């Protein structure tokens, strides 16, 4: 039988007690990996590995389509999306599908179409995955040399990297096209409480776009997560798409330099570790974006951010007490600081009380009430609009933390019954996934480096309990 692995490399792998167990023709003797090692059995079988990846893509797209239709079926137009536990429809709404002024859902048919298209796509991918896993050639090198590869072929690997970068760049341009030409996207900052609009004045200045990367991640700076302008977001995607496409072309046309050949480990497991590391970074950045940013993730769909809910409570009580005759400009709270308004460390007028820690919040319902030196007292007294009051009252009771509401410092009740903000779900899931992808990155990077150095030992199995158990057969 043709041995596809180095005996020296895999001498440590524990074998099954029943050596005859074979799954899809990939037994341990042939590959050096047991059945539960999954795709590791296919490291040197490019055709079968293609099948596994296409089938995996089919599963991902199937989930997207099925969950999309599930959310459409359960959607209640009279309630905000964030009160219904939705995580996919808010993304479609943010892209401008089916919504109008103030984030009101006008038509759910685009959401239905999206779900059906994903289901159809998943079927095509599923058939392709099954074909390549069961019927297609085991290796692509002989039949389709363009698609074939050897993990150690550095030039081929950077060509594949280039193709992936071009596809990512084209994905970024799809958002740009949607925003510029195909109906626009939802802008939470549009006058009067948000609306769908086409982006007409892209920000392409490298100083502005790359200035975000140079910002501090702390406080009012907020690194790239601080972006609060759709022109900057879409312009950033123009830059990102261009860099990815040009970088992809460059990687296809060039061979890796000598320093890159020396610096990197060139093996299947090493590439897996690099990919997991990149996905981990994506996960952590997405976590911060969905938790703090209310422009890319409008509060009309995802619910308020933590600081936004806190500031909304201060504004709601200021409006209420002002109508009852309180002088909100001079009233003192129990600490001697301003009860409703006070000054920040840098002199701006901000909301008083517990919410002062969130004084650098920017939100579309609040910014019209600011002047050159922070909150403007005369605007607070005269210019408040009903939509601002309604929105702040709604956000006050839908904090993403499900935090305790308080009146006069006494905790009274949780903000809403059975309410978990989509921001909480999305931020937590992306943080946890980002963390585990990082652990996977470290694990596979360590294994790849050890294998490259020639001293891979794996786990010492002499003391493993399973060795002394009765064989399964």
UniProtKB/Swiss-Prot annotation:
Binding-site list for [CaMn4O5] cluster: 367
Post-translational modification: Phosphorylated in both bundle sheath and mesophyll cells, phosphorylation increases when cells are grown under high rather than low light regimes (70 vs 900 umol photons/m-2/s).
GO biological process, one term: photosynthetic electron transport in photosystem II
GO MF, one example: electron transporter, transferring electrons within the cyclic electron transport pathway of photosynthesis activity
Subunit structure and binding partners: PSII is composed of 1 copy each of membrane proteins PsbA, PsbB, PsbC, PsbD, PsbE, PsbF, PsbH, PsbI, PsbJ, PsbK, PsbL, PsbM, PsbT, PsbX, PsbY, PsbZ, Psb30/Ycf12, at least 3 peripheral proteins of the oxygen-evolving complex and a large number of cofactors. It forms dimeric complexes.
Function text: One of the components of the core complex of photosystem II (PSII). It binds chlorophyll and helps catalyze the primary light-induced photochemical processes of PSII. PSII is a light-driven water:plastoquinone oxidoreductase, using light energy to abstract electrons from H(2)O, generating O(2) and a proton gradient subsequently used for ATP formation.
Record protein name field: Photosystem II CP43 reaction center protein
Lineage, highest ranks first: Eukaryota, Viridiplantae, Streptophyta, Embryophyta, Tracheophyta
